[in-house]
From Swiss-Prot:
Subunit structure: Associates with subunits I, II and IV to form cytochrome c oxidase.
Alphabetical keyword list: Cell membrane, Membrane, Translocase, Transmembrane, Transmembrane helix
E.C. designation(s): 7.1.1.9
Similarity remark: Belongs to the cytochrome c oxidase subunit 3 family.
Compartments (UniProt record): Cell membrane
A Gene Ontology biological process term: aerobic electron transport chain
Catalyzed reactions per annotation: 4 Fe(II)-[cytochrome c] + O2 + 8 H(+)(in) = 4 Fe(III)-[cytochrome c] + 2 H2O + 4 H(+)(out)
Gene, per the UniProt record: ctaE
Cysteine pairs bridged by disulfides in the record: none
UniProt name for this protein: Cytochrome c oxidase subunit 3
Recorded topology in the membrane: Multi-pass membrane protein
Keyword Translocase tagged: yes
PANTHER family cross-referenced by the UniProt entry: CYTOCHROME BO(3) UBIQUINOL OXIDASE SUBUNIT 3, CYTOCHROME C OXIDASE SUBUNIT III
Organism annotation: Corynebacterium diphtheriae (strain ATCC 700971 / NCTC 13129 / Biotype gravis)
Length: 205
């Protein structure tokens, strides 16, 4: 009995170590996110260059006039909230709480979907007012930057779906906990990028 208790005591630290120690998946994710950061840095540079040219000829202000800032703020809050739910999902994964992971990640997917639908509605509204990707430099800059970000949100939501599908088909393992953490890293990154885009596009204009 003493031996069994000793083995049980040793198992817990090993399980925690398996969840917390650096691994190639996490390192690879950090490298990938660094590349994504450079990609979005390029988009920001393109946006500000276009802005400088547009302000010079007076076309930029006309395009920004169509933006609905209060509406954009609402969908921004929704996306930021999804980052909170994603982190609660990670906490559940660290505890080995499969039900908690499913609940919080499902809510994250739902919030991400609401954000995407909200952005699609905004696109529809702008197109109705004559602003398209081909209508002006402002239109091109707006749709390219927000469109690429929306694609990343969609990719993140699909990654959460994959994590949930894997949970439904096998026992919960440290590898699955790592996958949950890695996807959350990506999701937090996408949310931070949107905050930067929101401030740049809707407030600085």
């Amino acid at each position: 009995m003493t031996s069994a208790i000793g083995n049980k005591d040793m198992a817990a630290p090993q399980r925690v170590a398996a969840l917390n120690r650096p691994n190639m998946v996490s390192v690879g994710t950090i490298v990938f996110l660094s590349q994504e950061l450079m990609f979005f840095a390029g988009l920001f540079a393109m946006y500000f260059t276009s802005r400088a040219n547009g302000i010079g000829n007076g076309s930029w202000k006309e395009g920004a006039h169509h933006l609905n800032v209060p509406y954009a703020l609402v969908i921004t809050i929704i996306l930021i909230s999804s980052s909170v739910t994603a982190q609660f999902g990670v906490f559940a994964a660290e505890r080995g709480d499969v039900f908690g992971v499913r609940r919080w990640f499902s809510l994250t997917i739902l919030l991400g979907a609401i954000f995407l639908v909200g952005q699609a509605y905004e696109y529809f509204h702008l197109v109705e007012h004559g602003m398209t990707i081909q209508s002006s430099v402002y239109g091109s800059s707006f749709f390219i930057t927000t469109g690429f970000h929306a694609a990343h949100v969609l990719a993140g939501a699909l990654a959460f779906v994959v994590v949930l599908l894997r949970l439904s088909k096998s026992k919960f393992t440290p590898a699955q906990a790592t996958a949950a953490m890695v996807v959350s890293y990506y999701w937090h990154f996408v949310d931070v990028v949107w905050i930067g885009l929101f401030i740049t596009i809707y407030f600085i204009q």
